[in-house]
UniProtKB/Swiss-Prot annotation:
It is found in: Cell inner membrane. The keyword rRNA processing does not apply. The active site is at E140. It holds the Pfam family Peptidase_M48. One of its GO terms (biological process) is proteolysis. It comes from Klebsiella pneumoniae subsp. pneumoniae (strain ATCC 700721 / MGH 78578). This is Protease HtpX. Keywords: Cell inner membrane, Cell membrane, Hydrolase, Membrane, Metal-binding, Metalloprotease, Protease, Stress response, Transmembrane, Transmembrane helix, Zinc. Binds 1 zinc ion per subunit.
Amino acid sequence: MMRIALFLLTNLAVMVVFGLVLSLTGIQSSSMTGLLIMALLFGFGGSIVSLMMSKWMALKSVGGEVIEQPRNETERWLMNTVAQQAQQVGIAMPQVAIYHAPDINAFATGARRDASLVAVSTGLLQNMSRDEAEAVIAHEISHIANGDMVTMTLIQGVVNTFVIFISRVIAQIAAGFLGGNREDEGESSNGNPLIYFAVATVLELVFGILASIITMWFSRYREFHADAGSARLVGREKMIAALQRLKTSYEPQEASSMMAFCINGKAKSMSELFMTHPPLDKRIEALRSGEYLK
């Protein structure tokens, strides 16, 4: 119930800001060009801001601590491993962080290849062998080298724009049809504003769910390629061993918003269509077949 209330309030806030910006810029909301411009700004705006703040948000989300100077042998090994792999793929040394969590997990984020972050859980360092941990780190380094964070942002921006634009076009038509378009009597050309808001809200929710299928598909696709990148860096058997170890780990504790960035996604889902990660068995099979290594 709280999520629904927050969604409605957020949508109302977006609608209000949308209207204010349209008024200030003099763009007519009934203009398809104006609506598309605003949908692009709002659609990409949130994604780009999230990307620019991704390192800070990720660290705050998991309570991670960036290693400035290694304090023990484990931290020295971790820093050296990240530095070596970053050099292998030709990227600048990422920041390295550790966060406290019992599950075996790690993630990479950052707005640019040369300004990135790799974070690992204490559960990973305590429960994985060095070879397995090395493979997981290589998986995250591959995400950075492949530019997955930026590509994900672009895809999210496109689907956000689609959802905002199409929802409001249909809502505008519905409000005009059901509420009567009486612009000449002083009412908005959008028709009844309550109908417009209700239809736009419902459609944004429905289209948002459908759009998430696209972003989740890309998230799963990039996991296969990051696994393959790890196999190239440290060897196929090490990556397979790491994935097999993940099968025995705790249910990931990271927030849902972080799942797309982690190597170990949640195992349970209503449908594979909405999973950020492919099933571990499929990832292992893909490595064994060499499907993404070609």
